Structure formats: structure tokens, C-alpha cells
A protein has these predicted regions:
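Active-/binding-site microenvironments in catalytic and ligand-binding cores
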Residues: 1-197
Length: 197
């Protein structure tokens, strides 16, 4: 796992004329993006991701899941039957409700995630980015990181630990996800913004 983030006071107004702190954290802390390089040696690194991939039309798929439950290909197809086909090069965001367990000990171990068939289906549609309100796009118990591997090989971006998805009242919206441009990094904390008409 990753260390707990910490803020280290470094300068202060009284002694230095200004306040400044140091920040120690994993690049995969909080709401964050995985670059393909996180799992593929020759995959794109976070600083190499183009702005075009970070600004897109997005579909919000609401599929409440309990711990250890898969988001399936059928879940996605049910959404498409009701709301229309998901466009190529768009983003897909899954609202499972798992964020409500953020303070629970099992949050990082028993989370829901995508099934391999669901991941392959999204990859076949040339989806740009997939996001979820859990700590991993894979099931917590998947030590092979099966879905990460599928997406990384296709150059797809992953955003994990999304919050406040319940505030998005539309199945379609405009998504902006802004990582830090950290050279050669495997990921970055992000600010994810939904614009709903």
C-alpha cells in the first residue's frame, strides 16, 4: 500500500515572511489518475497525456454494488439500451456508491470493480477514460490487476476514488480531469470536474 499523506510545515509568516509546507504523498493518493505506465513499461507517463484526453464527453453509469461485486458487461449494455450507445473516445464513469465506505477498514480490500468482460467491452469501444468511486478499477481481491492491464495496453486512462458522483443528475455530462504534469510519473492526484447542462 501507499503511505499516509503528510503536510510538513516548512516556513512561516512570523519567521520567514510567508507560509509554506511540504507535501509527502503517493502519486496515487485520493482521487487520482493512473497513466498506462503504471502497469505497462512502455506505456504513456502522466506528463505525456494530451489535453484532448483530459477533456471529454462522459457517461455516468449508476450501478450500486456491494463489496466484491463485479460491474458487468450487461450493466453497461443496460445503460446503453436506455440512454443510447456510448461514443468512442468518450469517458465512462461508474457510480457504485462505494465511496460511502471510505472510512471503513475494508474500503481498500473489498471494493467492487469491473469484470474482465466489461473491461474488454469498453476497450473495444475505444473509450478514452474510465473512472470509478472506489479505490481501484479492479476488484479489491484481484492481485493480477486484470482490468488495469487491459486498459493500460490500450492506452486508456483510469481515474479512481472519485467522489460526489451522486451530485451529477444527468447520465451524460462534460468531464475535465486535471492531473499534475509530473515528469515520468505513473499517476497523479487530480481535480475532476463535471459540467452538466
Amino acid at each position: 500500500g501507499s503511505p499516509q499523506p503528510s503536510f510538513i510545515p516548512w516556513e512561516n509568516v512570523k519567521e520567514d515572511g510567508y507560509n509554506l509546507e511540504l507535501l509527502f504523498l503517493s502519486t496515487h493518493t485520493g482521487t487520482h489518475m493512473d497513466a498506462p505506465y503504471h502497469f505497462i513499461e512502455k506505456g504513456a507517463k502522466i506528463h505525456e497525456i494530451s489535453l484532448e484526453k483530459l477533456v471529454s464527453e462522459a457517461a455516468l453509469i449508476q450501478c450500486r454494488k456491494n463489496g466484491g461485486e463485479f460491474i458487468t458487461k450487461i450493466d453497461i449494455q443496460k445503460f446503453e439500451k436506455k440512454h443510447g450507445k456510448i461514443a468512442s473516445f468518450s469517458s465512462v464513469i461508474f457510480y457504485t456508491g462505494w465511496q460511502r465506505n471510505l472510512q471503513k477498514k475494508y474500503y481498500f480490500e473489498k471494493n467492487p470493480g469491473l469484470s474482465v468482460s466489461a473491461a474488454k467491452y469498453l476497450a473495444s469501444k475505444k473509450i478514452n477514460l474510465v473512472g470509478i468511486d472506489s479505490p481501484s478499477i479492479d476488484l479489491g481481491k484481484d492481485s493480477k490487476f486484470s482490468v488495469h492491464q487491459i486498459f493500460a495496453k490500450k492506452g486508456m486512462l483510469i481515474v479512481e476514488n472519485l467522489a460526489n458522483l451522486e451530485k451529477i443528475k444527468s447520465s451524460k455530462f462534460h468531464l475535465v480531469v486535471l492531473p499534475l504534469k509530473l515528469k515520468n510519473a505513473t499517476g497523479s492526484p487530480v481535480r475532476a470536474i463535471a459540467f452538466v447542462e
